């Protein structure tokens, strides 16, 4: 007899490459995003969890990235 328990699974992950992110969000340039990623430990992006590395591939969690962007705006006040 199998025990089928409903476990909480995130409904969706919005992971995209840097290039895909920039194509979808034209306000951001490829170089600009890469600069943010390069400095992620200094600008708080690393703590946000928005950048995911799988081997050499760098993926961006769009939801977490935009939460981080919004927190940067709130911190500027």
Enumerate the language-model features and the residues they cover:
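A short, Lys/Arg-enriched interface patch at domain edges and termini
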Residues: 62-77
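Short linear motifs in intrinsically disordered/low-complexity regions
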Residues: 4-7, 40, 62
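Major-groove DNA-recognition helix of helix-turn-helix-type DNA-binding domains
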Residues: 23-59
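A detector for short, charged/polar N-terminal pre-domain segments
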Residues: 1-16
